Amino acid sequence: MTEKNDLFEQNVTSQNIMVATHVQSSIPSVSRSKFRSLTLINWNGFFARTFDLDELVTTLSGGNGAGKSTTMAGFVTALIPDLTLLNFRNTTEAGSTSSSRDKGLYGKLKAGVCYAVLESENSRGQRVISGVRLQQIAGRDKKVDIRSFSLQNINENQSVISILTEQVGEKNARVLALNDLKEKFDGSEVQFKQYHSITDYHSFLFDLGVIPKRLRTSGDRSKFYKLIEASLYGGISSVITKSLRDYLLPENTGVRQAFQDMESALRENRMTLEAIKVTQSDRDMFKKLITESTNYVSADYMRHANERRGNVQQAIEKRQEWYQSKSKLTLEQQRLVEFSREMQDLEQGESSLEAEYNSASDHLNLVMNAVRHQEKVERYQDDVAELNERLEEQQMALEEVAERQEMAQARATEAEDQVEELRSQMADYQQALDAQQTRALQYQQAVNALEKAKQISGLANLDLHNVEDYHAEFVAQADEITDKVFELEQRLSVSDMAKSQFDKAYELVCKIAGETDRLQADSVARELLSAYPSQKAHAQQAVALRQKLTELEQRLHQQQNAERLLAEFNQKAQAELENAEDLESYYEEQQARLEDLEAELAEFVEVRSTQRQQREQLNQQYQQLAQTAPAWHTAQSALARLQEQCGETFDSSQAVMQFMQNTLSREREATLERDELARREQLLDEQISRLSQPDGAEDIRLNQLAEKFGGVLISELYEDVSIEDAPYFSALYGDARHAIVVRNLEAVKAQLQQLDDCPENLYLIEGDPNAFDDNVFKSEELGDGVVVQLSDRQWRYSKFSEFAVFGRASREKQLEKVKAERDETTEKHAERAFDVQKCQRLHQHLSQFVGTHLALAFQPDPEVAMQEIAQKRAEIERELNQASGTEQQLRHQLENSKAQLQLLNKVLPQLNILADETLQDRVEECREQLLEAQEDEQFIRQFGNALAQLEPIAVALKSDPTQFEQLQADYKRSVEQQKLQQQKVFALADVMNRRLHFSYQETVGAEGSALNEQLRQRLDNAQREREQAREQLRQATAQFSEYNQVLTSLRSAFDAKNQMLQELLQEMDEYGIRNDDGAEERARIRRDELQQRLSQHRMRKSYIDKQVAVIQAEMDNLNKAVRKAERDYHTQREIVVQAKVSWCLVLKLSRNSDVEKRLNRRELAYQSAEELRSISDKALGALRTAVADNEYLRDSLRASEDSRKPENKVVFFILVYQHLRERIRQDIIKTDDPIDAIEQMEIELSRLTNELTSREKKLAISSESVANILRKTIQREQNRILQLNQGLQNIAFGQVKGVRLVVNIRDTHAILLNALSNDREQHSDLFENQKLSFSEALAMLYKRVNPHIELGQRTPQTIGEELLDYRNYLDLEVETFRGADGWMRAESSALSTGEAIGTGMSILLMVVQSWEEESRRMRAKDILPARLLFLDEAARLDATSINTLFELCERLDMQLLIAAPENISPERGTTYKLVRKITNNQEYVHVVGLKGFGRV
């Protein structure tokens, strides 16, 4: 892909017109192609007729229906055989209907095969026969079938009719079908060709110069047909004038195609970049696939390798475990024999210890029960005494509360009666209606009170006169009774105290001696008190006796313990040692033996500790090496990969560093070569850009200056020179080959001073650009150069250069060479860029290796040292295992010696006790004395407090207080009399208080109100007293109830405690023991000692029993373990054998596929199975996603998940490698290893990305360049239109004296051009946006600068493509100069018919000439196309107009076919008279041809 100028300006020059006469003189003269004849076969009226066509004008003259239109229709059909276009409107023959698909052609044919054939002669002198075969198709639609064909290499003397027909007899002929025609020329020099498409047919006609334009599409055919149709029917065709730009202005397909190619290249470039991104993602996917598959398979591979190694190790361990179990079983059998013997001895001594322990335990329980009973008795005695005191106190308090309650009850009753009486009085007073009634009521109440007092006192004669005397008497009696009550109360209190003392003393006697008669209580008390001092003295001696007994029992116990220990020692030592000397000597022997064993064991332990330290050191070294080993293996893998990438073998780190320096040097050299090639490529691109300029201008400023001066570059004038002439003209002009040809140098001179930017040397030549003469210099060819005389004194000699700027052909030839060199340079640059990136990547790998692995890569293999350490460690382990048995024996002997020494240490201090033989008798005697003292102590403890209380009050037992009940009854009677007397006193006092009421009998009415008030006050006072009495009664009642409840609870508690006390005393009597303070402790000590001995004995027995059971169980387990170990060993060995088969298959697959190196990653061998499984599982999850779209790999991956077949994983890895190998582009990447391919792919993709990015910058075109191209193209077309106008200057038809074309630039598009060239920075946001194509940016700019224009629903891409067509920037109009109106727009309504026909013909001639110029580059250089137009109904033209047409045809070397009625008689050309005749019922057209008959 070249630069922008090569894209957009290479085809602009196709529209240049050869106007310089010196250029034409340099090119050999080429004659124009001509139509020679028209042949119609089997048409309506023409069975076989050939019309020879004149070189200028051929006229068909005849009346209506003579066949003129049919002849022209045959010509048009042979020229354009397209049924979609053919439409002969002016025909009236039968068969032409509006619904017929032949559009008037069906009726012009006869049944059978028909032909319309054109014979022409091109510029090369070749005879070309082309035409169509027509045939009617039966049916209502009246279709016509058309087949086009051509013939070449036909002899000149052979007519067309003889070719298409075959004579049958003397007077008949047969029309040949196409197949017959083809068979006729098979094997001959004649080239017959039938065309299956109209495009191929027209391409043939164009290539041989029959038609002026290559008709590629139906649109081109439609234009050509409309041009023929317009010329046929005459006049100004509105179809052509409305789209005059499409006809006159050539479609600059080169520029549009160049723009499309540029956009397509940019789009392709960007798509390639996107594809590179996709490829990079694919590369990442490949990289991920190979990485994850390697992790997936290698982790499983190493896990199986570790498992296989572990299985072998386990098999060895199982075998060792089997042998160890056997040795353990033998040792346990020996231990079982020893423990069984000791067990028998322990069973014999256990029974005696159990009996002693049970006896001591029973004695302790008895003592503890006695102590607990004694404690309970003492506690209950204290509780009973306390409760008795509290009961007496509560009884006295209850009696006081009962008295207070009775008094409160009496006061409450009296207050209640008084309130009721006052209420009744008040009720009576309230019922009275007046004061008299009230007093009467009071009087009545007084009378009632008197009657009540009489009843209470029993005095019938009581009245107001003696009430005071009786009241005084009753008060005295009440005082007397009160004194008596007080006296009785005192006597009752004293009597109560005496009774309580007697009762208490009696209770104490009964408590001590049991139930006793009240009369004998005094004698029993004296007996108890007389024996009390002696019992108390005996009780005090119990403590000393108890201590003495304790000491004796302890010595006895020590003696028994010593005897037991001595017996146990003799049993264990298997000796009969009894005296102290033997024991001491034996002790010294055992002490010396113990020291020897301890020294030997310490030395042994020290040696074993040293071995363990060595083992720990070896383990640490092994661990360090194990930690270093993965990194070392990783470094080795990296080193191997680096050696593969470098193609070198490194022996040391210095070699790596040296190679790294060499790589850096190679990178610098390759970088210099790459940069040099890049500069060379840039120079070649610039040269290509200059050669791609349409006019050969090497400096863009020359084009701008030529446009500014209104001139033309001289190289543009010589654009069409041949390759042979280009060196001559280039040498002729020398440095002036880039000169500008201007019309007037003086006019340009004034503008030179205002130039800001121009080349260093600017050459200007005066001359007419449209008719430039090369006689500027006097020159003469001299050998391989030319001598140019610049002046009389200055000549210049220039040699013919190999490459000349002049001429498009020369530049194109040089452009091909430069492009070839550029392509070669580009390829070399790509290779060097790849080498640079390869060196950079290699240097990066080296740097990464140096930074990460260099420190470990060249160190020795840690696994070798690990194997040596493992051997040493195994030897130490063997020694430690052997030493373990020896140490166990030493420790067993040491424990036996220590146990004997411990027993001796216990026995030796007690040898003196063993000699005391009277110890047992003294213990028994002291125990009897202690029992007597304990009985007295128990009696004193039980009844000592009672005797102490009885001693001061024992005198009260002498007299029994039996009169207490009589005194209590008298006291109660006196209290009743006191109450009755108080009621009498109260009744008499009430009468005395009412004495005033008795006087109300007569004077009631005067004092009622005061009495009522007095009653109310009394009632209020009485109610308050009643409430107080009630409250006091409630309080007294509550207090009495509370005291009564307390008394009841105390009495219940006293009874319960007393009963329990009696029961406890009875139980103590039943036990028959008396406790002292140390009895329980001694019994417990004795019991604990025996319990400890028994416990130790049982513990030892239990231990021995357990040991026996453990040994038996251990032996059972060992038997099972031996069998299991043997079974496990054989099972493990089978596993090893089976795993070996599978492993051999895996190794075979990996080695045959050359993937073992990838899978055997030793750095993974030091990870656990779980870690490896985790790596494999993670990789499996990633692989499931990666191969989801690949059914083959997906199935293989699914099969590889079977853990029973590890070889499937290797198969999957091999398939992945094959899959990646198949996707390696061998033309790009020269390797079979996918990993190396990924590395090279990264380098290649990086290089392509850089190259495409720079290529995109080169492909981009600036808006200013587009504006210049469009402006230059528009200027050239304007110049061409100007030249076309010059050919129409002398045309005159009627009043029309001239015809011209007017071309203008549209205002909206002119604004767009200005914006493209002048406002680049302002609109850079559009053209620098990579998301927009150039066409879309151009459309958006057009909308931005012309916001008033509505673009409709078209897309920006479509609008932009239209704006790249310069024709859309121009408006074309046809103007005529007619009479006094001057120049005006050509319209049919403003012209006569003849004027319109002539004007239209002039326009059509311009179109044909424009088409020729447009297609000049697509034709051969030695061919000029034929020019032919039609004119039907030429009778509209006068003779002058006809002559004008003849002149126009002669001047433009054009042929004209005219159809005119009989009154038309042209003076020149060939005229055919057509007359339709009927002979023998056969219709035919009689044709007579004449040349120039008008002048005859």
Swiss-Prot record:
It holds the Pfam family SbcC_Walker_B. GO terms for molecular function: ATP binding; DNA binding. It comes from Glaesserella parasuis serovar 5 (strain SH0165). Its main location: cytoplasm. GO terms for biological process: cell division; chromosome condensation; chromosome segregation; DNA replication. Plays a central role in chromosome condensation, segregation and cell cycle progression. Functions as a homodimer, which is essential for chromosome partition. Involved in negative DNA supercoiling in vivo, and by this means organize and compact chromosomes. May achieve or facilitate chromosome segregation by condensation DNA from both sides of a centrally located replisome during cell division. GO terms for cellular component: cytoplasm; nucleoid. ATP binds at residues 62-69. The keyword Cytoplasm applies. InterPro entries: MukB, MukB/SMC, MukB_hinge, MukB_hinge_sf, MukB_N_dom, P-loop_NTPase. Keywords: ATP-binding, Cell cycle, Cell division, Chromosome partition, Coiled coil, Cytoplasm, DNA condensation, DNA-binding, Nucleotide-binding. The hinge domain, which separates the large intramolecular coiled coil regions, allows the homodimerization, forming a V-shaped homodimer. Homodimerization via its hinge domain. Binds to DNA via its C-terminal region. Interacts, and probably forms a ternary complex, with MukE and MukF via its C-terminal region. The complex formation is stimulated by calcium or magnesium. Interacts with tubulin-related protein FtsZ. This is Chromosome partition protein MukB. It is found in: Cytoplasm, Nucleoid.
